[in-house]
Amino acid sequence: MSYFGEHFWGDKNHGFEVLYHCVKQGPVATKELADFIRERANIEETYSKAMAKLSKLASNGTPMGTFAPLWEVFRVSSDKLALCHLELTRKLHDLLKDVLRYGEEQLKTHKKCKEEVLGTVDAVQMLSGVGQLLPKSRENYLSRCMDLERLRRENTSQKEMDKAETKSKKAADSLRRSVDKYNSARADFEIKMLDSALRFQAMEEAHLQHMKALLGSYAHSVEDTHVQIGQVHEEFKQNVENVTVDMLLRKFAESKGTGREKPGPLDFDAYSSAALQEAMKRLRGAKAFRLPGLSRREPRASVDFLESDSGVPPEVDDEGFTVRPDISQNNGAEPPRFSSSDSDFDDEEPRKFYVHIKPAPTRAVACSSEAAAAQLRATAGSLILPPGPGGTMKRHSSRDTSGKPQRPRSAPRTGSCAEKPLASEEPLSKSLFGPPLESAFDHDDFTGSSSLGFTSSPSPFSSSSPENVEDSGLDSPSHAAPGPSPESWVPRPGTPQSPPTCRAQHPEPRGLMPRAPSPGPWGPEGGADSLTPADPTREGLAATLRRPRSRKVSCPLTRSNGDLCRSLSPSPLGSSAPTIPPDRPSFSTQMGHGISRGPSPVVLGSQDALPVATAFTEYVHAYFRGHSPSCLARVTGELTMTFPAGIVRVFSGTPPPPVLSFRLVNTAPVEHFQPNADLIFSDPSQSDPETKDFWLNMAALTEALQHQAEQNPTASYYNLVLLRYQFSRPGPESVPLQMSAHWQCGPTLTRVSVEYSYRAGATAVSTPLTNVQILLPVGEPVTSVRLQPAATWNTEEKRFTWKLPDVCEAGGSGHLSASWQPQSGPSTPSPVAAQFTSEGATLSGLDLELLGGGYRMSLVKRRFATGMYLVSC
C-alpha cells in the first residue's frame, strides 16, 4: 500500500519536504545503531575480562582444606562465562562491521536518489511560484471589475468606460493564464510527487527491512549467548551437586593423609633399658674437655697424620715444634686431606692449597652412540640453568661445611670423544632442540593427533623440499616451567621418523574393503550417511572447557580417557577410505656430544604474536568405468594445526592466552564438516556459505598439548587434528587424473590398455602429480608377458606396477599396455588402481585466516593424495 502517495499532499505542498527529511534520517539511525552495538560490545568485553579476572581469583584459591577442589568448579564456570561473553563480543563486532558497511551503502543510495528527485524539487518550486502569482492576478482582476462597475454607476463618459473595460479584459486574460499555468504546474507536480513518494517509500521499506535484519542478528547473537550462559550455569549447578561432601572428605584424606598406622603402646622396662644403653655409649665415646688453640705448642692433627703415614721421622726445631714439610719437595706423596681445627692462629699463617686432579681411567677407544647420549644426559643434568630475565643467581662457595676446598667434578669422557670433535654434533643439536616449527609438516605423522589418541591412516606424503621459513623461537625453551621437574629441560636423544615411500599394494577385493571410521570425539555437521556420529553421552561445551590444574575434582568435570584414545580414519566415507598404505621404513640418527641452549624462550607479551602452522590434507576417491568420461568422485580432508613445543609453557602460565580463532574461506563446495568437539567450537547460525568461523577451547587445547608433551617431551612441535570434511566432485573435470582401461580376454591371449590424462581444472592452482604408480593385478599364472613401457612384477602380491614420472599440465597424458598368454583359460578383468600425491594445492580450495590477535600463521601446507582410485573395464 502506498502510504506516502496518499498522505503527503496538502495545500501548502510540504509533503515532499517532509518525505525527503524522513529519508535523510535513515543514515542517522544507522549511525546511532552502530554506536549502540559498539557500546554493547564494549560492555560485553569488559564483562568478559572481569570474568577472566574472577577465574584467576578462583584459581588462586587456597589448595589447603577440604573445600579446595570446589575452586576448580568455580574456575571452569568462570572461564566458560568469560568465553561466552567474549564470543558475543566477537559477534557484535562482526555485526558492527555489517552496520557500518550498510551505512556507507545507504549514503551512496541517498546521493543517487537526490539526483533522481531533482525534477520533483523543480516542480514543487514551480507550483509554489505559480501559487503565489495566482492571488495577485485574482486581486487585479477583481479591482478592475470593481472600477468598471463604479464608472457605470457614476455615468462616466464612454471613453472612460472603454478604458476600464479594456483593463478588465486584460486582467481577466492574465487571471486565466495564471490559472492555466497553475493547473499545468499542479499536474506536473502531482505526477512527480507521486513518483518521488513511491520511490521514498521503497527506500524506507528496504531500509527498515535491512535494519530489522540487523536487529534480528543482534537478538539472535544475544539469545545464543544467553542459552550458552544458561547451560554453563546448569553445568555449574550439576557439578556442585556431583561433588558430594563424602567425596571432598575422601579426597582430602587421600591426598593430605599422614598414614594409617596408629602409634603402639610402650613398655617401660624395654624403653628405659634402651635409653640407658644409649647413654653409656655416649659416655664411653666422649673425650676430655679442653680449650683448643690456647698454645702453639700443641701439635697439629695434620702433623700426626703425616707422622703416621710417612716412613721418614718428622723434623723438629730447637723449641720442639715439628717443621711442616715443603709441599714442593714432596710431590710423590699424596697431599694432606685433613687440617687442624683446634687452633685459633690458623689464619695468621700463609696457607697453600694443593689440588690434584686425577685423570679419568682409560676406557675403550670406541664410543658408542648410546653411551655418548647417556653421558650427555648425565652432564646436562648436572648443569645449572642461567637466571631468567631480571633474575639473579647466587654464586656458591667452593668450600664445604668443614672449610676444606672441594674437588671439582668432571663428567667422564671416552677416548674417542676427547680426541677430536665429532662430526655428528649438528644432528645432536637438531635432536636436542628440534627443527623449526614449519618442518613439522615434513614428516609423515603430521596428520596425527597423538594428544587426543587419534590414529590416522598412513600418509603417502614424503618431505622432498622443506621450506625455508623463519624459526618460531619456541622449539627449545631454556627455562624450566614452574610445574615439571628439572628433567623436563634435560635434552634427550630423539628418534625422528623418516618420510615414507609410496608402495602400492595389490588391489584385490580383500584389500579394497572399506574401513569403517572408529568413533571418536567428533561432532558431525552433516547427514548420518556420511559421517560417523559422536558419542550420544558426550558432554558438549560444558564438558570440554577446563584447564588442567594441580588439584582436580574426581567427578564428571573431567572426561573419561576412553573417548580420547579412540582412533578415527582420515576418510569418514563408508566405502571410500584409502586402503593402500605406504611403507614406513625406520630411521635412526647417531648421536654425538655437544649441548646448546637454543633460542631464548618466548614470554607472552615479548612478541607480537605466537606462531602456529596448519596443513590441509585431502584424499580423492574416484571410480571410472571403461572408456566412459564420467566418474564417481568424493574427496575427504582434514585440517591439522601444529604448535611449537615452547608454547605449552605459555599456555599454562599467566596471564591466560588469548582465544585462538580462525575462519575457513571458500567453504561452499564442502558438504559436511566434522569438527573435533573436544577442541573447537563453531557458530551454527552463520549464514554465509563461503565462510565458516571456529574458535578453540583454550583449556582443552592446553590439556591436549600438555598430554603430548608428557608422552614425547623431546618433540619440538605437536600436531592436533581440528576437523575433517568431505564433499562430492561430479564430472570428469573434478579429478586430477582421468583414466580409462580396456581388457581383451581371449582363450590364448589377453591384452590390457590403460590411458591416463592430467586435468588441470581439478585444482585452483595446477600442481604436478608425483609418485605416480599404476597397478595392474594379475591373479593367474601367465606366460609371454609383454609390457609397454616396462613395469615391475611383484610375485607375492601378483601385480604389475608402472612407476611414471611426474604428471603435469604439459604433456600430462600417456598410454600403457600389457599382454600375456593365460595358462588357465581366459583372464578375468580386474580393476586397475592408481596412486599419486601432490603438494601445494587442494581439491577443495579451502583456505584459513586467523581472527583476532595474539597469533600469526607461520605456514599453511596444502597437499592431496589418492584414496581408492580405480578404473574397471
UniProtKB/Swiss-Prot annotation:
<dbReference type="InterPro" id="IPR018808">
    <property type="entry name" value="Muniscin_C"/>
</dbReference>
<dbReference type="GO" id="GO:0098843">
    <property type="term" value="C:postsynaptic endocytic zone"/>
</dbReference>
<dbReference type="InterPro" id="IPR027267">
    <property type="entry name" value="AH/BAR_dom_sf"/>
</dbReference>
<feature type="compositionally biased region" description="Polar residues">
    <location>
        <begin position="816"/>
        <end position="827"/>
    </location>
</feature>
<dbReference type="GO" id="GO:0072583">
    <property type="term" value="P:clathrin-dependent endocytosis"/>
</dbReference>
<feature type="modified residue" description="Phosphoserine">
    <location>
        <position position="600"/>
    </location>
</feature>
<feature type="domain" description="F-BAR">
    <location>
        <begin position="1"/>
        <end position="248"/>
    </location>
</feature>
<feature type="domain" description="MHD">
    <location>
        <begin position="609"/>
        <end position="872"/>
    </location>
</feature>
<feature type="region of interest" description="Disordered">
    <location>
        <begin position="153"/>
        <end position="172"/>
    </location>
</feature>
<feature type="region of interest" description="Mediates interaction with AGFG1, CALM, DAB2, EPS15, EPS15R, ITSN1 and clathrin">
    <location>
        <begin position="593"/>
        <end position="873"/>
    </location>
</feature>
<dbReference type="InterPro" id="IPR054713">
    <property type="entry name" value="GMIP/FCHO2-like_FCH"/>
</dbReference>
<comment type="function">
    <text>Functions in an early step of clathrin-mediated endocytosis. Has both a membrane binding/bending activity and the ability to recruit proteins essential to the formation of functional clathrin-coated pits. May regulate Bmp signaling by regulating clathrin-mediated endocytosis of Bmp receptors. Involved in the regulation of T-cell poliferation and activation. Affects TCR clustering upon receptor triggering and modulates its internalisation, playing a role in TCR-dependent T-cell activation.</text>
</comment>
<dbReference type="GO" id="GO:0005829">
    <property type="term" value="C:cytosol"/>
</dbReference>
<feature type="compositionally biased region" description="Low complexity">
    <location>
        <begin position="567"/>
        <end position="576"/>
    </location>
</feature>
<feature type="modified residue" description="Phosphoserine">
    <location>
        <position position="368"/>
    </location>
</feature>
<dbReference type="GO" id="GO:0005905">
    <property type="term" value="C:clathrin-coated pit"/>
</dbReference>
<dbReference type="GO" id="GO:0005886">
    <property type="term" value="C:plasma membrane"/>
</dbReference>
<keyword id="KW-0597">Phosphoprotein</keyword>
<keyword id="KW-0175">Coiled coil</keyword>
<comment type="similarity">
    <text>Belongs to the FCHO family.</text>
</comment>
<keyword id="KW-0168">Coated pit</keyword>
<comment type="subunit">
    <text>May oligomerize and form homotetramer. Interacts with AP2A2 and AP2B1; 2 subunits of the adaptor protein complex AP-2. Interacts with DAB2. Interacts with clathrin (CLTC or CLTCL1). Interacts with EPS15, EPS15R and ITSN1. Interacts with AGFG1 and CALM. May interact with ACVR1; linking this receptor to clathrin-mediated endocytosis.</text>
</comment>
<protein>
    <recommendedName>
        <fullName>F-BAR domain only protein 1</fullName>
    </recommendedName>
</protein>
<keyword id="KW-0472">Membrane</keyword>
<dbReference type="InterPro" id="IPR001060">
    <property type="entry name" value="FCH_dom"/>
</dbReference>
<dbReference type="GO" id="GO:0035612">
    <property type="term" value="F:AP-2 adaptor complex binding"/>
</dbReference>
<dbReference type="GO" id="GO:0005654">
    <property type="term" value="C:nucleoplasm"/>
</dbReference>
<feature type="region of interest" description="Mediates interaction with the adaptor protein complex AP-2">
    <location>
        <begin position="267"/>
        <end position="439"/>
    </location>
</feature>
<feature type="region of interest" description="Disordered">
    <location>
        <begin position="302"/>
        <end position="347"/>
    </location>
</feature>
<dbReference type="GO" id="GO:0048268">
    <property type="term" value="P:clathrin coat assembly"/>
</dbReference>
<dbReference type="Pfam" id="PF22699">
    <property type="entry name" value="GMIP-like_FCH"/>
</dbReference>
<feature type="compositionally biased region" description="Low complexity">
    <location>
        <begin position="447"/>
        <end position="466"/>
    </location>
</feature>
<feature type="region of interest" description="Disordered">
    <location>
        <begin position="381"/>
        <end position="600"/>
    </location>
</feature>
<feature type="region of interest" description="Disordered">
    <location>
        <begin position="813"/>
        <end position="833"/>
    </location>
</feature>
<dbReference type="Pfam" id="PF10291">
    <property type="entry name" value="muHD"/>
</dbReference>
<keyword id="KW-0254">Endocytosis</keyword>
<dbReference type="InterPro" id="IPR042735">
    <property type="entry name" value="FCHO1_F-BAR"/>
</dbReference>
<feature type="modified residue" description="Phosphoserine">
    <location>
        <position position="343"/>
    </location>
</feature>
<dbReference type="GO" id="GO:0050852">
    <property type="term" value="P:T cell receptor signaling pathway"/>
</dbReference>
<feature type="region of interest" description="Mediates membrane-binding">
    <location>
        <begin position="1"/>
        <end position="275"/>
    </location>
</feature>
<feature type="coiled-coil region">
    <location>
        <begin position="155"/>
        <end position="178"/>
    </location>
</feature>
<dbReference type="InterPro" id="IPR028565">
    <property type="entry name" value="MHD"/>
</dbReference>
